[in-house]
Design a protein with these regions (language model features):
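Conserved small-residue
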Residues: 13, 33, 40, 68, ...
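Short, intrinsically disordered C-terminal tails of secreted or membrane-associated proteins
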Residues: 316-325
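Short, well-ordered amphipathic alpha-helical segments that serve as non-catalytic structural scaffolds
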Residues: 7-9, 132-148, 174, 178, ...
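Conserved catalytic cysteine-centered active-site region
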Residues: 1-39, 64-66, 70-91, 172-202
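Short beta-strand-to-turn element immediately C-terminal to the catalytic PLP-Schiff-base lysine
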Residues: 98-102, 176, 235, 262-266
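Acyl-CoA/ACP chain-elongation machinery
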Residues: 48-70, 75-86, 117-131, 159-168, ...
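Condensing-enzyme catalytic core mediating Claisen C-C bond formation in acyl metabolism
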Residues: 74, 78-147, 156
Length: 326
């Protein structure tokens, strides 16, 4: 049997960059990368770190494919998040990272701030979400509260939106409970990239940050008919040039480990073009592992070395910094 440690990629990248400080791997299924981002932000908030590389990677294998097939939640065609006819997800693989930096050690022009975050554990079922969306409701509500903004100020929601009957119904119920009849524009990018599991929020955090930076709302592919439980209709076309100030991004894992992140423009730092991060890095790769974080200030030139390990298809480099704890 060929195997490797679950933190193999974490250790490999740390070794390649000569990192000997704080290194860890988080494995909480589909919320892994979101929890890595939160951990990095909280450690910086409490002055345990100056900077942190946070995110996740995951790769397809037969074990994963067979596992989801046994749950009967794989769609044999293209997945259809939030559509009435949805039957399951499409698996993907990839990686995405943010580099968070403290305000005091900020050196480069960044994109935005991580203004809020929350993790909840509803423990409703080993692989399913509660019909009322309790875990999703709590994680979104607490992330919004920790940011100090009101729900009506959110401009876009990057939903978890796997395309499975249970997840989308549960998340939809949670959205209705928080926003009522005034749900902000939302969409799932998983119809584009598939569900990348432990890497999902690493990649989708990048999408969320770029939504703010570029004024974009991404389309929810393959949607034709609203699900009767909520009647919610996602965005189905690319919106450009939209003033996006606050983006809520959801990642919900097996066992009810639900996490939400809130990315925001900061008025003061927008004027100075310095927000709450140092760098943003994204890649789509064929590699296996989960999130990691590190100590010390990381410069863009060093961050670029990460991508030489895996021949990335997509590479994005730019600056940023993290926020206050909840």
């Amino acid at each position: 049997v060929i195997s490797h440690d679950c933190g193999a990629s974490t250790e490999l990248i740390a070794s390649y960059l000569g990192i000997n400080d704080f290194i860890t791997t988080i494995s909480t299924a589909c919320s892994s990368a979101a929890n890595a981002i939160m951990l990095g932000a909280r450690m910086i908030k409490h002055e345990l770190l100056d900077a942190a590389i946070v995110g996740g990677t995951d790769a397809l294998c037969r074990f994963t494919l067979n596992g989801f097939n046994s749950l009967m939640i794989l769609d044999k065609t293209h997945c259809r998040p939030f559509d009435r006819s949805r039957t399951g997800l499409n698996l993907g693989e990839g990686a995405g990272y943010l580099v968070l930096q403290s305000e005091s050690s900020l050196q480069r022009t960044p994109y935005c701030e991580l203004s809020g975050y929350a993790n909840t554990n509803e423990a409703y079922h080993q692989t399913g979400s509660s019909p009322e969306g309790d875990g999703a409701f709590l994680s979104m509500s607490e992330a919004i509260a920790s940011s100090g903004i009101s729900p009506k100020e959110i401009d876009y929601i990057n939903v978890h939106g796997t395309g499975t009957p249970g997840n989308d119904a549960s998340e939809g119920m949670a959205l209705r409970r928080i926003f009522g009849e005034h749900v902000p524009p939302f969409s799932s990018v998983k119809a584009f990239i598939g569900h990348t599991l432990g890497a999902s929020e690493g990649i989708e955090a990048v999408y969320s940050v770029l939504s703010i930076d570029k004024g974009l709302i991404y389309p929810n592919l393959n949607f034709t008919d609203a699900m009767p439980e909520t009647g919610l209709i996602p965005e189905t076309s690319l919106q450009e040039g939209i003033p996006i100030r606050h983006v809520l991004s959801n990642s919900f894992g097996f066992g009810g480990n639900d996490s939400s992140l809130l990315f925001s423009v900061n008025e003061f730092f927008q004027h100075e073009r310095t927000f709450k991060y140092l760098s943003l890095c994204s890649q789509f790769i064929f590699n296996a592992s989960l999130p990691f974080i590190r100590q010390r200030i990381i410069h863009q030139e060093i961050i670029a070395l990460i991508f030489r390990l895996t021949n990335p298809i997509i590479r994005i480099l730019s600056p940023m910094r993290p926020c206050a704890d909840a």
